[in-house]
Amino acid sequence: IRFNNLTLGYGTRTLIDSLTGEVRCGELTALVGRNGTGKSTLLRAIAQLGEIHSGDIFLNGKPIGDISPAELSTLVAFVTTDKVRIANLRCRDVVALGRAPYTNWIGRMQQLDNEIVEQALASVGMSDYADKTMDRMSDGECQRIMIARALAQQTPIILLDEPTAFLDMPNRYELCTLLRKLAHEENKCIFFSTHELDIALELCDSIALISPPQLHILPTEEMVRSGHIERLFTTGIVSFDPETRTVSIKEK
């Protein structure tokens, strides 16, 4: 994903201004920043679900405006923060929706498609839920099914908007470890927003940090040394120590 002088916002408000940089294949990149600074707006713009004020986004070297919806579905999979409840559809069938770009005009699944669906379910630890319906599952379980759908789509780019939001602590680390493995072993570009700074610092190759209206994209080690993370904490009550990579609350 490459950004060229990209400006995003809504109405007259600019959230991200004149962004130039890239999110690379083979890496897990976290998008961090305060609430309301444009994390979801940026992800939605990459997925052609939001407007661009100016500049451009390139996917695999091609301007996003020149990419058809059909082609985009083979390039980008997007997992949103929306709570999905599909009452009458089995989890296996929900994950199979990720194969839609590759099936024939009547949507018939081939043996390879079925194998990919089963592998996606196994990757997120949800094989035992394959025949259950999502209306009988927790938020975290539903989120994992939607991530499995994205994996089944087999795109080079995967976008996730706060994928760990409904997961407990062990599952947060397990999920991000899985995403890192996919990025490294399958050369995928995986870009996800998160408020889990500790996970981002430990597991991500690069960090994209929004400091309105700028967005800085750096390898994790460089981001730690850059001072950008410290500037997130502007109240004086909370501080970030780049040596220990920890956030602490100052005593009164």
Task: Spell out what each predicted region is.
Residues 32-34:
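The feature captures the beta-strand-to-loop junction immediately N-terminal to the Walker
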Residues 47:
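Helix-to-loop junction immediately C-terminal to a conserved catalytic motif
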Residues 55-63, 72:
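Conserved ABC transporter NBD signature motif
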Residues 96, 111-129:
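Conserved ABC ATPase "signature" region
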Residues 158-161:
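Catalytic Walker B motif of ABC-type/P-loop ATPase nucleotide-binding domains
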Residues 194-195:
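H-loop/switch region of ABC-family ATPase nucleotide-binding domains
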Residues 233-252:
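ABC ATPase nucleotide-binding domains
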